[in-house]
Amino acid sequence: YLRPNFKGNIKKYLVVYFGPTMLLFLSGAFYFLIFPQQFDSQLTTLQSVTQQTTTLTPSSLLLISVLQVIIIGPVINIIPTLGEELGWRGYLQPKLCQVVSDRAALVITGVIWGVWHLPVIIMGHNYGTDYIGYPWLGILAMILFCVSLGVIEGYATIKLKSAVPAAMIHSMVNASAALPIYLAKGDYNLILGPAIFGVVGGLPFLLVAIWLLIKVGKKPAINS
């Protein structure tokens, strides 16, 4: 699963490279469609960032951030994410596929991945500590997000017989998951969004994951 298997799979890799990024933008648009009052057209958050760190205007910084996500998001964190994905998608998922269906393996791997985040969620990473239902709602939200993202990454792993595409998707998410927050006013609930690890912000990822689970069906186990 360390080999990228580029030969004959360039079109699939283009989908892996750009598809999740487009899904990220769709997720942000979806969130602000549901909560239009939280959209900050004045880019207040970015204004505070630019005043402290750069001479760029907020709109220029936003444009640069978006272009960075599109162009280098899938590879900027590829080394650490590949190390992690070799464990999740390169080892655990194929092992599970030897005893359960591919569909079940994708979901179980995602659940375990989500539970693995439990300590940092309790520490307040991603969702903070001041929300109703702390820390259980945060844990459940993270598990839901990890299942959604894990199914997408796992499906790419099955199709390309490599953990590299999963690492690329993971890299993009690490580089850009919180990007929609820069477009939001300060009264949002991180359990809901606007970042993609929120329940509403991540709904497009969940819908794609459900579609992929339907596609993968109960097929023979992946050969390790």
Task: Please report, for each region that a protein language model flagged, where it lies by residue.
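Specific transmembrane helices
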Residues: 1-81, 178-224
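Hydrophobic alpha-helical membrane-insertion segments
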Residues: 14-31, 109-112, 152-159, 163-170
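Transmembrane alpha-helix/helix-exit interface in multi-pass inner-membrane proteins
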Residues: 25-37, 84-85, 106-126
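Membrane-interface interhelical connector segments
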Residues: 46-53, 87, 92, 121-134
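Residue-level hotspots within the lipid-embedded alpha helices of multi-pass solute transporters
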Residues: 69, 77-82, 114, 142-146
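Membrane-interface helix/loop boundary segments of multi-pass membrane proteins
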Residues: 82-115, 154, 158-162
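Membrane-interfacial alpha-helical segments at the cytosolic side of multi-pass membrane proteins
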Residues: 92-100, 125-128, 179-184
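Functionally important transmembrane alpha-helices
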Residues: 103, 107, 130-192
